Amino acid sequence: MRNFRSSVLVVLSLIIVLNVARASAKSKVHIVYLGEKQHDDPKFVTESHHQMLSSLLGSKDDAHESMVYSYRHGFSGFAAKLTKSQAKKIADSPEVIHVIPDSYYELATTRIWDYLGPSADNSKNLVSDTNMGDQTIIGVIDTGVWPESESFNDYGVGPVPSHWKGGCEPGENFISTNCNRKLIGAKYFINGFLAENQFNATESPDYISARDFDGHGTHVASIAGGSFVPNVSYKGLGRGTLRGGAPRARIAMYKACWYINELDGVTCSFSDIMKAIDEAIHDGVDVLSISLGGRVPLNSETDLRDGIATGAFHAVAKGIVVVCAGGNAGPSSQTVVNTAPWILTVAATTLDRSFATPIILGNNQVILGQAMYIGPELGFTSLVYPEDPGNSIDTFSGVCESLNLNSNRTMAGKVVLCFTTARDFTVVSTAASIVKAAGGLGLIIARNPGYNLAPCSDDFPCVAIDNELGTDILFYIRYTGSPVVKIQPSRTLVGEPVGTKVATFSSRGPNSISPAILKPDIAAPGVSILAATSPNDTLNAGGFVMRSGTSMAAPVISGVIALLKSLHPDWSPAAFRSAIVTTAWRTDPFGEQIAAESSSLKVPDPFDYGGGLVNPEKAAEPGLILDMDSQDYVLYLCSAGYNDSSISRLVGKVTVCSNPKPSVLDINLPSITIPNLKDEVTLTRTVTNVGPVDSVYKVLVEPPLGIQVVVTPETLVFNSKTKSVSFTVIVSTTHKINTGFYFGSLTWTDSIHNVVIPVSVRTQILQNYYDEN
């Protein structure tokens, strides 16, 4: 493997590193974005890029040596090594929309599908009606794929879809025959990363190929479209038949993220991501699943610095649904990422499954904590909370992050109780390591509810509880002469009384770039999701692992979209989003209230979970959809202040924005968000009937607190001649002060279909005012 890697690195170095030897030492990779391509033939597009670069650098040889990528399929542009002055000069060219330096992005089951409804065991549901997503292609941009995983077996899978134009690119430990009828494509993109970084073959164990070292990409791909794998569990927990959302959909992996080392983790170059999107458009994917994202502050959706938004714009224009993770910076507000209106942005919820771990105190009180402990029962053992008894010169700390301040004898041979307010879930494993190194036998961590389970080693129990239960245990310790505790192995608990919650880590709205665009759009399970992984994953158990994040929630939606695409092949990306958002659950599948994890549990609002929890069966027959086409996106670009020439190049045709600028409130989204209501506003939506031809819908309005909402007309009539109808919404406020957001809804119903449009309104009497009071 190392010999192959060395030869690959030599070749890549000759192509990338030595190719830029003539460039200034101060040069770095810049992306030159030209918008919609002007030629259908990719060769002509690339030639035009070389001509432009030759004019800048003075020769064809210099242009060839500077070029890193030519984006030539879905859109036009290139990545090249340029100095600041060269970048500034080419940016002044009238053909160029943006020039920016390269940047980096970060990474953002057995129970899921039974929980959400489309079970493969039912002969009359979405999975069976769509032949499990057969003939749809899910493209995944991530860390690669482990092709030998059973999740990518092609048993019972038919021929490769005829619209597929991609292939399987050989590389380190990866040959073309690693692909099959399930995993039909695999490519890797590293040129952008190599142009700015030295790839240390000794330090980084990643593969210079589409093969996945980290396991993240394998996990994501198997959630979206993994094949059936029976009797899968994580070391005995969560046992069942594993499958993806669309078990017969095809997977195409585009590796643009690279594992550097344990300290630096995984990095994804913007130029590599752009090339991956460009290739995915060419190859013919139907859905593009991207579990990556930037950080706040965000760049405008019309700014090339948001590379995912830029690439996604062109993918959506070609009919590809782009699904992105909303980010893991919750529960703080205004943290959601991937906020462009043409992207389907996903929040994460829990499942109705937990891993209950009995803690039995010496007074026979039983407390059910959460853990992934699969070791033997720990019999009654001394229980301690490290604190100063009042007559000691030693240092004591019951804070989980500071357990190392305690002497070993404080914890040796005991189970330790500690408290933490930290949100970082690594606190669990770090505290457990400290206790174990000191000779401790177990750990009970009291913390705010809702944080990820971080499994400790198999033979070491570390159990999470909330602060209330932690205080109960602390009182037991303080008022008992010789406190003891017994810890039993974890067990899987499904259904009652486990409730569904928006995960604490899931990033929240409102949208910090364009507050009138509701984000996230939708929520899906993303906590402790069991799926395939790479054997190199340190938590790997038989080829499978549990991970948490909006990275896991996004491919759930991608799998649902693949099923819906099979059922409605002519729908636009906006139609799929509308169907998913307007039919979502506001309660869990069993009718219980969903909660949102924050500093405390609360009733969720659209900034927590968009339309709600995805309801795949209802999304298949939404009744009405709010559709959008390129003109709607042009409306948005104009409202965002993009100039006419830039929009024209972006969309590939002459475009002139109206004067005055259109209102962002009139974009035909399946939501209504008004961030700065002062005077009465009127907005318009258009709905299209995709249900029975002759249908009549009546409106039900639940206005936000202190907000008046008037809908005209109140009844919509559809027939063979009338497929689409517009309605107006007049919104006014009774508030006399600046308020926060209040929430309501607008529902069109024909007694069978309920088309729910979430409404979010903030009164701003004094505009652009920030108040800390």
Curated annotation (Swiss-Prot):
<dbReference type="InterPro" id="IPR036852">
    <property type="entry name" value="Peptidase_S8/S53_dom_sf"/>
</dbReference>
<keyword id="KW-0732">Signal</keyword>
<feature type="active site" description="Charge relay system">
    <location>
        <position position="142"/>
    </location>
</feature>
<dbReference type="InterPro" id="IPR022398">
    <property type="entry name" value="Peptidase_S8_His-AS"/>
</dbReference>
<dbReference type="InterPro" id="IPR045051">
    <property type="entry name" value="SBT"/>
</dbReference>
<dbReference type="GO" id="GO:0005576">
    <property type="term" value="C:extracellular region"/>
</dbReference>
<feature type="glycosylation site" description="N-linked (GlcNAc...) asparagine">
    <location>
        <position position="643"/>
    </location>
</feature>
<dbReference type="GO" id="GO:0006508">
    <property type="term" value="P:proteolysis"/>
</dbReference>
<keyword id="KW-0645">Protease</keyword>
<feature type="active site" description="Charge relay system">
    <location>
        <position position="216"/>
    </location>
</feature>
<keyword id="KW-0964">Secreted</keyword>
<keyword id="KW-0325">Glycoprotein</keyword>
<dbReference type="GO" id="GO:0004252">
    <property type="term" value="F:serine-type endopeptidase activity"/>
</dbReference>
<feature type="glycosylation site" description="N-linked (GlcNAc...) asparagine">
    <location>
        <position position="231"/>
    </location>
</feature>
<comment type="similarity">
    <text>Belongs to the peptidase S8 family.</text>
</comment>
<keyword id="KW-0068">Autocatalytic cleavage</keyword>
<dbReference type="InterPro" id="IPR023828">
    <property type="entry name" value="Peptidase_S8_Ser-AS"/>
</dbReference>
<dbReference type="InterPro" id="IPR037045">
    <property type="entry name" value="S8pro/Inhibitor_I9_sf"/>
</dbReference>
<feature type="propeptide" description="Activation peptide">
    <location>
        <begin position="24"/>
        <end position="108"/>
    </location>
</feature>
<dbReference type="Pfam" id="PF17766">
    <property type="entry name" value="fn3_6"/>
</dbReference>
<feature type="glycosylation site" description="N-linked (GlcNAc...) asparagine">
    <location>
        <position position="536"/>
    </location>
</feature>
<dbReference type="InterPro" id="IPR000209">
    <property type="entry name" value="Peptidase_S8/S53_dom"/>
</dbReference>
<dbReference type="Pfam" id="PF00082">
    <property type="entry name" value="Peptidase_S8"/>
</dbReference>
<feature type="active site" description="Charge relay system">
    <location>
        <position position="551"/>
    </location>
</feature>
<feature type="signal peptide">
    <location>
        <begin position="1"/>
        <end position="23"/>
    </location>
</feature>
<dbReference type="InterPro" id="IPR010259">
    <property type="entry name" value="S8pro/Inhibitor_I9"/>
</dbReference>
<feature type="domain" description="Inhibitor I9">
    <location>
        <begin position="29"/>
        <end position="108"/>
    </location>
</feature>
<dbReference type="InterPro" id="IPR003137">
    <property type="entry name" value="PA_domain"/>
</dbReference>
<feature type="glycosylation site" description="N-linked (GlcNAc...) asparagine">
    <location>
        <position position="408"/>
    </location>
</feature>
<dbReference type="InterPro" id="IPR015500">
    <property type="entry name" value="Peptidase_S8_subtilisin-rel"/>
</dbReference>
<protein>
    <recommendedName>
        <fullName>Subtilisin-like protease SBT3.4</fullName>
        <ecNumber>3.4.21.-</ecNumber>
    </recommendedName>
</protein>
<keyword id="KW-0378">Hydrolase</keyword>
<dbReference type="InterPro" id="IPR041469">
    <property type="entry name" value="Subtilisin-like_FN3"/>
</dbReference>
<keyword id="KW-0865">Zymogen</keyword>
<feature type="domain" description="PA">
    <location>
        <begin position="382"/>
        <end position="474"/>
    </location>
</feature>
<feature type="domain" description="Peptidase S8">
    <location>
        <begin position="112"/>
        <end position="620"/>
    </location>
</feature>
<dbReference type="InterPro" id="IPR034197">
    <property type="entry name" value="Peptidases_S8_3"/>
</dbReference>
<dbReference type="Pfam" id="PF02225">
    <property type="entry name" value="PA"/>
</dbReference>
<dbReference type="Pfam" id="PF05922">
    <property type="entry name" value="Inhibitor_I9"/>
</dbReference>
<keyword id="KW-0720">Serine protease</keyword>
<feature type="glycosylation site" description="N-linked (GlcNAc...) asparagine">
    <location>
        <position position="200"/>
    </location>
</feature>
